[in-house]
Amino acid sequence: MEVRYSQDSESGMLLKNGLKEGKEGKDSQGSISKTFLKDQQESFSPSGAVENCEKSRASSGDPDYCRRILVRDAKGSIREIILPKGLDLDRPKRTRTSFTAEQLYRLEMEFQRCQYVVGRERTELARQLNLSETQVKVWFQNRRTKQKKDQGKDSELRSVVSETAATCSVLRLLEQGRLLTPPGLPGLLPHCGSSSLGSALRGPSLGITANGGSSSSSRSSAGSSGTAGGSPPLPTVTSSGTVTGLQGSPPAHGLFSFPMPSLLGSVASRISSTPLGMAGSLAGNLQELSARYLCSSAFEPYSRTNGKEALDKKVLE
C-alpha cells in the first residue's frame, strides 16, 4: 500500500500545533501573572488587610471592639497594629474655630449679660456673628469652665492673703507688746482659756520696773490675780531685759518659738523712758485687739504643732 503525503500539509500541521502550544503557554503565563498580581494587591490593599486582620482576629480571639491593620514603616517593613473600631481613620481632622476680635467682644458681652444663652437667643446671636449654633454653644461652655477655674484660684488666693495678713498683724502686735496681757485684764481670752495657746498668751503677764526700782502696786495686783486664778506667780521684767518668776515655765522659748527674755527685753527697752504710762497704753492697745486676731486661723498651725508635740511626748513616755 502506498502512502503519500504532502510536505506542505505536514508543515501546516506543525505550524498549527506550534501556534496552539504558544497560545496555551501564553494563556497559562498570563493567568499566573494575574494570579500573582491579585495576591500581591490583596495582601497590600486595605480591604485585603482588613480581611486578613478579621481572619487573624477570629483565630487569635481578639475582642470585638479591636481591629488589626497593616502599616508600612519608613524602612519598608510591614507591621501589624491593633486599633479600636470606633477610631475613624478616614475622617479628616477637625479644624479649630478661630474667632475674630469683633466676635469675641460680642460673645464676651453676651456672657457678662447672661452665662446661659439658649433657644432663640442663641440662634439670633449665631446668625448675627455668622457662626453656627454649635460653635456658640461650645464657646459658652468653655467660657463657663474658665470662669469656674478662675473663681477657684481667686478664692484660694484670697484665703492665703487673709491668713498672711492676719499672721502679719499678730506678729506686728506681738512685736509692739500688745499681746502681753497686763495684770488688770485677766479675762481677755475667754475662748482660748483651755488651750495651750491661751496658756501661752496668759503666761507672759508682766509687771515692769525701770532703773532698778520696783512697783509695789503692780506686784500686789499680780500676786492677787495669780493666787485667785490658781496660776503660778507672774513674771517680772526689769529694764535690763531679765525675767523673774518663770520657774514653772519652759526656759527656752515662749509664744511662736521666740526667745521670751530677748522679746520682753526689747519691749522693756522701748518703754523704759515712760514707765508710768505703760499700763494705760497696754490696756488701750489690748482693748483694740479683737478676738479674731487671737483665735483666727493664723494660730492654728502653732496649736496643732503643740498638740502633736504633747501627743508624741505621751507616746514616748
Swiss-Prot record:
Entry comment describing in which tissues the protein is expressed: Expressed in the anterior neural keel and later in the preoptic area and optic stalk.
Function: Transcription factor that is required for closure of the choroid fissure and together with Vax2 is required for optic nerve differentiation and to limit retinal development to the optic cup.
Biased composition (Basic and acidic residues): 18-27
A GO MF label: DNA-binding transcription factor activity, RNA polymerase II-specific
GO biological process, one term: brain development
Region spans: Disordered: 1-62, 203-248
DNA-binding interval(s): 92-151
InterPro entries recorded: EMX-VAX-Noto_Homeobox_TFs, HD, Homeobox_CS, Homeodomain-like_sf, HTH_motif
Signal peptide: none
Major location (coarse): nucleus
Keywords associated with the record: Developmental protein, DNA-binding, Homeobox, Nucleus, Transcription, Transcription regulation
Gene Ontology CC terms, in alphabetical order: nucleus
Protein's name in the database: Ventral anterior homeobox 1
A Pfam family that the UniProt record links to this protein: Homeodomain
